[in-house]
């Protein structure tokens, strides 16, 4: 078996190894040889080479299977390849069971249940023990020299030598942990296209050693200037011990009224105490995160908020903070309500209104796609209308990140009425699902109903969703005769059940964008450059008297007081607070504005 430090990534087997409350992630080149495999695991778990261990892998049914022979190891790898899983999940226990069939010390059936325990994850590579870290300042990645900065735990830091790299770069570290880090010891990689130019930094290839760790220029947490800010602004972002002078807490806000509620969160209108600026705060209870995968959508939402914050048709982020029991996203307050509320008042919209809204939505979706993000939750409720009448997409918890040209994903998700046929078929999919959802939304705007109405169904509620999915997959969509030829044409284009033939779904997303812009529904009616600059007058201007006006929000929410229920100490005690390390975030551009007030 090749060393796990091999730099060749294609064909490596990812071993996700659970041992005594930790997850150690390592990589090995096939073929796996039993003795080498056990030696690798003992080293990763810091066990003596003569120590007996028991190794079990988890099959696709979630059952633990022992690995005691080369044949059993080969079978585990064969099953991994046939199931096309991304990793081999392994549990390691010290010693052997007293008798065959008996559990090992520390083994009980709950250890195999997903989400039953919290595991501290370590990525082992070249002797480095990397952990995901939310870095509070911009730090240069030792490999690609781009800056590790943003929302979420996108940075990896070695717990021993404190080497900092992007997650995507950690397998390109050539030097072993503890060795002097010099330029020749690093695999050359092209700097990322998003590198910040002219950042204040004295980083170089030289290194010095301080104490037991590595003191490299790339690891000094230099503040660098944000676009449009001054050096002074940037340098005051953090104080000497790394805590933020701009720290935000619940005490900074006065909660006014509830403006929305979903499956996972409540949204409250709030006033910033010192600036009197109005925001919306999305509040999520930590107790709902009882599965390891549940936390992922929060990290995704933060990451997409960061990408969206300066784009005109996407809701931006002010800050994030937490208490022992809750997470808080402070976001833009958009006073015109959402398209769902607007449609309830209007029943259906003129084609020119639908053309304007769908044009701005196309620009917003293309912006996300150009950054490798599938939105996956386009619906009337998630399209907000600002005070001038322009739209903003919101709610990024369903997004899928890191989609490059030709990449596909397979997660079954979305709002039932908007789910694309390829998702329902279990096919892998890409950006195509967003253009299908836009077709559904445009149909709703212009026809005043869903293209998949199942009103009058005799089935029980349990079967209604299955029947809806059957309709989406099989039934031909009937376009109302009242719609123009142009409108009918674009609906047929977006609602094509074959994603390879669907409007906007070219491998080159810019080519797909051109196809949409040049469709007869838009051609000659929209100046796309002016639209992106918000220089096209909206067809509807919501009557908003002030930033506190709630006229365009449903009274079932606004009549509710924004009270937070008292914390239950027993519930708090069961929450693993380390899962939320680094959740705090402050948009430096927002805080600079507040400082100037």
From Swiss-Prot:
Gene Ontology BP terms: antifungal innate immune response; cell differentiation; defense response to fungus; embryo development ending in birth or egg hatching; establishment of cell polarity; establishment or maintenance of cell polarity; gastrulation; gonad development
Active site (catalytic residues): 377
Reaction(s) catalysed (UniProt annotation): L-seryl-[protein] + ATP = O-phospho-L-seryl-[protein] + ADP + H(+); L-threonyl-[protein] + ATP = O-phospho-L-threonyl-[protein] + ADP + H(+)
Cofactor: Mg(2+)
GO molecular function: ATP binding; diacylglycerol-dependent serine/threonine kinase activity; protein domain specific binding; protein serine kinase activity; protein serine/threonine kinase activity; zinc ion binding
Listed transmembrane segments: none
Cellular localisation: Cytoplasm; Cytoplasm, Cytoskeleton
Region (Disordered), start-end ranges: 192-238
Outcome of substituting residue 219 to A: Prevents binding with num-1 (isoform a and isoform c)
InterPro entries to which the protein is assigned, alphabetical: AGC-kinase_C, Atypical_PKC, C1-like_sf, DAG/PE-bd, Kinase-like_dom_sf, PB1-like, PB1_aPKC, PB1_dom
Domain of life according to the entry: Eukaryota
Span of domain PB1: 12-95
Disruption phenotype: Worms show defects in embryogenesis. Mutant embryos show defects in their polarity and cleavage patterns which disrupt hatching. RNAi-mediated knockdown causes a complete loss of nlp-29 expression following fungal infection by D.coniospora or physical injury.
Residues engaged in binding ATP: 259-267, 282
EC number of the protein: 2.7.11.13
Tissue expr: Abundantly expressed in the anterior and posterior pharyngeal bulbs, the pharyngeal-intestinal valve, vulval cells, and a region at the posterior end of the intestine that corresponds to site of co-assembly of the intestinal-rectal valve and anal sphincter, and depressor muscles. Modest expression apparent in four hypodermal cells that provide cuticle and muscle anchorage in the tail. Strong expression observed in discrete patches and spots in vulval cells and in somatic cells of the spermatheca.
Stated role: Required for the normal progression of embryogenesis and viability of the organism. Plays an indispensable role in establishing embryonic polarity and in recruiting and maintaining par-6 to the periphery, through interaction with par-3. Required for epithelial cell polarity in the distal spermatheca. Phosphorylates serine residues of num-1. Required for the expression of antimicrobial peptide nlp-29 in response in response to fungal infection or physical injury.
Full protein name: Protein kinase C-like 3
Source organism of the structure: Caenorhabditis elegans
């Amino acid at each position: 078996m090749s060393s796990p430090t091999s730099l060749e990534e294609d064909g490596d087997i990812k071993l996700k190894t659970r041992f005594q409350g930790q997850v150690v992630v390592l990589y090995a080149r096939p073929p796996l040889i039993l003795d080498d495999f056990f030696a690798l695991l003992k080293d990763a778990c810091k066990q003596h080479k003569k120590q007996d261990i028991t190794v079990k892998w988890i099959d696709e049914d979630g059952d633990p299977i022992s690995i005691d022979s080369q044949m059993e190891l080969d079978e585990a790898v064969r099953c991994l390849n046939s199931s096309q899983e991304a990793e081999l999940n392994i549990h390691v226990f010290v010693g052997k069971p007293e008798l065959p069939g008996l559990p090992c010390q520390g083994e009980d059936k709950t250890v195999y249940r997903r989400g039953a325990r919290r595991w501290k994850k370590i990525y082992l590579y070249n002797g480095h023990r990397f952990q995901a870290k939310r870095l509070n300042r911009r730090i240069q990645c030792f490999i690609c020299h781009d800056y590790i900065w943003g929302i979420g735990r996108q940075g990896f830091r070695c717990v021993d030598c404190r080497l900092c790299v992007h997650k995507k770069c950690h397998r390109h570290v050539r030097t072993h942990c503890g060795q002097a880090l010099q330029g020749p010891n690093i695999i050359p990689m092209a700097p990322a296209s998003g590198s910040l130019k002219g950042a204040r930094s004295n980083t170089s290839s030289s290194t010095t050693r301080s104490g037991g760790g590595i003191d490299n220029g790339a690891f000094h947490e230099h503040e660098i200037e944000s676009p449009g800010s001054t050096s002074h602004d940037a340098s005051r972002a953090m104080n000497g011990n790394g805590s933020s002078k701009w720290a935000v807490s619940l005490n900074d806000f006065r909660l006014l009224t509830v403006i929305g509620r979903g499956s996972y969160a409540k949204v409250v209108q709030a006033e910033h105490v010192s600036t009197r600026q109005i925001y919306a705060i999305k509040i999520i209870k930590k107790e709902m995160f009882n599965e390891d995968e549940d936390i992922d959508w929060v990290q995704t939402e933060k990451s997409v908020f960061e990408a969206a914050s300066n784009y005109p048709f996407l809701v931006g982020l002010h800050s994030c903070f937490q208490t022992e029991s809750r997470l808080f996203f402070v976001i833009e307050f958009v006073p015109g309500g959402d398209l769902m509320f607007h449609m309830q008042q209007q029943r259906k919209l003129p084609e020119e209104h639908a053309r304007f809204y769908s044009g701005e939505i196309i620009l917003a979706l293309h912006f996300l796609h150009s950054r490798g993000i599938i939105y996956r939750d386009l619906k009337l409720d998630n399209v907000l209308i600002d005070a001038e009448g322009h739209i903003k997409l919101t709610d990024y918890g369903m997004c899928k990140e890191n989609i490059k040209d030709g990449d596909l994903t397979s997660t079954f998700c979305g709002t039932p009425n908007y789910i694309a046929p390829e998702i329902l078929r279990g096919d892998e999919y890409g950006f195509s699902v967003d253009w299908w959802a836009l077709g559904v939304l445009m149909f709703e705007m212009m026809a005043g109903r869903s293209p998949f109405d199942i009103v009058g169904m005799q089935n029980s509620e349990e079967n209604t969703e299955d029947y809806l999915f059957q309709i989406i997959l099989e039934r031909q969509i009937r376009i109302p005769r009242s719609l123009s030829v142009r409108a009918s044409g674009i609906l047929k284009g977006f609602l094509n059940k074959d994603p390879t033939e669907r409007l906007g779904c070219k491998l080159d997303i810019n080519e797909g964008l051109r196809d949409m812009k040049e469709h007869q529904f838009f051609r000659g009616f929209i100046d796309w450059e002016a639209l992106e600059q918000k220089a096209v007058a909206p067809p509807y201007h919501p009557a908003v008297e002030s930033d506190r006006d709630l006229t365009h929000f449903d009274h079932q929410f606004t009549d509710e007081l924004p009270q937070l229920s008292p914390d239950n100490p027993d519930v708090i005690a069961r929450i693993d607070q380390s899962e939320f390390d680094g959740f705090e975030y402050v948009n430096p551009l927002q805080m600079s504005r507040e400082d100037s007030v």
